[in-house]
Swiss-Prot record:
It comes from the Eukaryota. Keywords: Glycoprotein, Repeat, Signal. Residues 41-382, 397-439 are annotated as: Disordered. Residues 1-29 form the signal peptide. This is Vegetative cell wall protein gp1. Glycans are attached at residues 399, 455, 493. Major component of the outer cell wall W6 (crystalline) layer. PANTHER family: KERATINOCYTE PROLINE-RICH PROTEIN (PTHR48138:SF2), KERATINOCYTE PROLINE-RICH PROTEIN-RELATED (PTHR48138). N-glycosylated and O-glycosylated. It comes from Chlamydomonas reinhardtii (Chlamydomonas smithii).
């Protein structure tokens, strides 16, 4: 008998221990990771859950461990000791929150039976439940959440505190830890309560209400023991005020400086007037100069825009909605951007055109000798000088770019004839093949008097072997003041055999039958050679030859 009496308490303790283990096992079974209810780590439940109030369904699971607390979010953290045994609380709240409260209702009953048994043996355990003992406080704590819905009280019933008593013995040490997480949780709900636009926070409470209906009966058995923790949440609530992000608007204040766009200063710089178009001298080609200005403006524009761009980054920092108004202020900054373009025509472009003219002068030197030799011929009639044309006008098609007669282009010459034999071709021009008769004409920028011209040198770029007949005739274009232009042939039926390789062909001023005899000062006084005309032979279906340069040999 004595043994039995001594064994009785031991057996009772063993039974209690078995019940607790069974309950824990069941909780673990429900809380298997990847199962219906996941066991969040102790730190995870408080902080992550509140931040994601938007999805109501996820929110309830996180509070599930804290569900022992009456306020759906706040008290939960105190019970977070449950992490070891959060399973019991989690089943009730989560299940009702997502799909249907009905399944959870059966779940609470199952924990209920164990709860009565544990209370009697773990009389020592009550110390942990003792804090929850004051049920009355629990209603007050729900009071703040009341605006969301009376649901908070209902969570208190589901508070399977009955399971919690057994849990406290083992996780008693953790219990202190939960309080620390709890403060974070309340802050999140707290901002909602004060802030009118806290619709998100109400959303989580709304899921909570479903829980109360089913577990309403269980609520009486457990007199809202977790209420004591609830008072703790109120204390954290003060920290909540700091949570309001209004301080973030401070960044916007810097944003106003961004509107300061000093872009207006750029506009003052008046766009420099475009450089006066130089007169069209015989030796200076106009086309090159105009193209140069456009490229120069492009570079200036990129540097200026970067300055306005920095302000735009500032608005991004004030991600909060309040700053959004600030961005409009930066928007005005774009108007200044047009101002930068104005500087673009700054003097910088003007220099750019200057280089383009510089090349033109370089060729001019070649013509410059022209005037000097012209006076010399009289004293030394034997001397022969080669004069190259600076500009050429093709009345048909020049370099394949002309659409109608009269187009102008620069004609390039070489000072040394010997060095050009059978070596690369110069940029030349050729008549359109569709012309009938097909012809091309090069006109010198300045005419030479007939008396000073010994012969004509033409550089031909030979591009095809057939047909044998390349040029039907080569003519000098001669004009006299007050008279119409006339053409005097100086060669006829020029064939490939005469050209040999692309090079220079020189023709004298010997007259041809049917034309004026002799082109000289005695025959045609005051007449000048204006240019050279080449007529393509009738047998050339697709002429591929071109005149690269034409020059006059002075006497």
């Amino acid at each position: 008998m004595m043994r039995r009496q001594h064994a009785a308490p031991l057996v009772g303790a063993v039974n209690v221990l078995m019940v607790v283990l069974a309950f824990v096992a069941s909780a673990n079974a429900q809380c298997v990771p990847g199962g219906i209810f996941n066991c969040p780590p102790s730190p995870a439940p408080p902080s992550p859950a509140p931040p994601s109030p938007a999805p109501p369904s996820p929110a309830p699971p996180s509070p599930a461990p804290p569900s022992p607390g009456p306020p759906s979010p706040a008290p939960p953290s105190p019970p977070s000791p449950a992490p070891p045994s959060p399973a019991p609380p989690s089943p009730a709240p989560p299940s009702p929150a997502p799909p249907s409260p009905a399944p959870p209702s059966p779940a609470p009953p199952s924990p209920a039976p164990p709860s009565p048994a544990p209370p009697s043996p773990p009389s020592p355990a009550p110390p942990s439940p003792s804090p929850p003992a004051p049920p009355s406080p629990s209603p007050p704590s729900p009071a703040p959440p009341l605006p969301p819905s009376p649901a908070p009280p209902s969570p208190s019933p589901p508070v399977p505190p009955s399971p919690s008593p057994p849990v406290p013995p083992s996780p008693a040490p953790p219990s202190p830890t939960p309080p620390s997480p709890s403060p974070p949780v309340p802050p999140s709900p707290a901002p909602p309560s004060p802030a009118p636009p806290v619709p998100p926070s109400p959303a989580p409470p709304s899921p909570a209400p479903p829980v109360p209906p089913s577990p309403a009966p269980p609520s009486p058995p457990s007199p809202a023991p977790p209420s004591p923790p609830s008072p703790a949440p109120p204390s954290p609530s003060p920290p909540a005020p700091p949570s309001p992000v209004p301080p973030s608007p401070a960044p916007p204040s810097p944003a106003p400086p961004s509107p300061k766009p000093p872009a207006p200063p750029p506009p003052p710089s008046p766009p420099p007037p475009p450089p006066p178009r130089p007169p069209f001298p015989a030796n200076t080609p106009m086309p090159p100069s105009p193209p140069s200005p456009p490229p120069s403006p492009a570079p200036p524009t990129p540097p200026t825009p970067p300055s306005p761009s920095p302000p735009s980054p500032v608005p991004p920092s004030p991600a909060p909605v309040p700053p959004s108004p600030a961005p409009p202020s930066p928007a005005p900054s774009p108007p200044p951007s047009p101002a930068p373009p104005t500087p673009s025509p700054s003097p910088s472009p003007s220099p750019s055109p200057s280089p383009s003219p510089s090349p033109s002068p370089s060729p001019s030197p070649s013509p410059s000798p022209i005037p000097s030799p012209s006076p010399k011929p009289s004293p030394s009639p034997v001397a022969v000088k080669l004069v190259w044309a600076d500009d050429a006008i093709a009345f048909d098609d020049l370099n394949g770019t002309s659409t109608r007669p009269g187009s102008a282009s620069r004609m390039v010459g070489e000072p040394d004839i010997a060095g050009t034999k059978c070596k690369g071709n110069l940029k030349g021009w050729m008549p359109k093949p569709s012309r009938n008769p097909r012809w091309g004409q090069a006109v010198f920028s300045g005419g030479r008097t007939v008396g000073s011209v010994a012969n004509v040198t033409i550089r031909v770029a030979f591009a095809t072997e057939k047909p044998a007949l390349i040029y039907s005739s080569i003519e000098l274009v001669v004009y006299n003041t007050g008279a119409t232009l006339i053409r005097v042939p100086i060669a006829a039926n020029v064939t490939r055999s005469q050209i040999r390789c692309p090079g220079f062909l020189t023709y004298g001023t010997t007259p041809i039958a049917g034309y004026p005899t002799g082109i000289d000062a005695t025959t045609w006084p005051n007449w000048k050679i204006a240019g050279v005309r080449i007529n393509m032979g009738a047998g050339n279906k697709k002429p591929k030859t071109s005149i690269d340069a034409v020059g006059l040999n002075l006497k």
